[in-house]
Amino acid sequence: MPGQRKLGRATDQRKAILKNLTTALFVSGRIETTEARAKEVKNIAEKLITLAIKEADNFTSKQVKVSAAKVDSKGKKLTDTKTSKNGKKYFVVEREQKTDMVSVDNASRLHARRLIMNWVYRPTTADGKNINITDKLFDEIAPKYKDKKGGYTRIYKLGPRRGDAAEMVILELV
């Protein structure tokens, strides 16, 4: 008996379906799908959440020098006029140096982040902004379940789907 359900699809199609469903679950918190797909997504989501919980606090902070363009009150870059050796004038963007505190992942957290990225897509909002699911897992979802040991998702049965009578369910984060 195989370790995972085949879902009547080729391997690449099956993985794409599971990635889409897993991403949708983490973005919206709940999905409506068939029972077989929900059981597979539940296994994947539980493992990813457990991984995020274990590695949630495994990072360090360090100071980094950052160079950025100076901007005026309207948000436009400030420029300065310079003269070249040949006597031609050109514009140079004025820059400012500052130091920022940046969090840097340790090796095990970086590995966990890459494993999570294997199972989710990079969705966008209606405005076109990217949603970073790995950051959402580490910063929002993992702290919520920090004291729990499993059981992060639940399945509600809805009944058969009209047309092919497939058993429909709602999979949601608890």
UniProtKB/Swiss-Prot annotation:
Record GO terms (molecular function) = structural constituent of ribosome
Q: Which family does it belong to?
A: Belongs to the bacterial ribosomal protein bL17 family.
Record organism: Ruminiclostridium cellulolyticum (strain ATCC 35319 / DSM 5812 / JCM 6584 / H10)
> How is the quaternary structure described?
Part of the 50S ribosomal subunit. Contacts protein L32.
Q: Has keyword NAD? A: no
A GO cellular-component term linked to this record: cytosolic large ribosomal subunit
Q: Which UniProt keywords apply?
A: Ribonucleoprotein, Ribosomal protein
Q: Output the GO biological process annotations, alphabetical, semicolon-separated.
A: translation
Which SUPFAM superfamilies does its entry note?
Prokaryotic ribosomal protein L17 (SSF64263)
Indicate yes or no for the key word Ribonucleoprotein: yes
Q: Which domain of life is it from?
A: Bacteria
Q: What is this protein called?
A: Large ribosomal subunit protein bL17
Please name one Pfam family that this protein belongs to: Ribosomal_L17
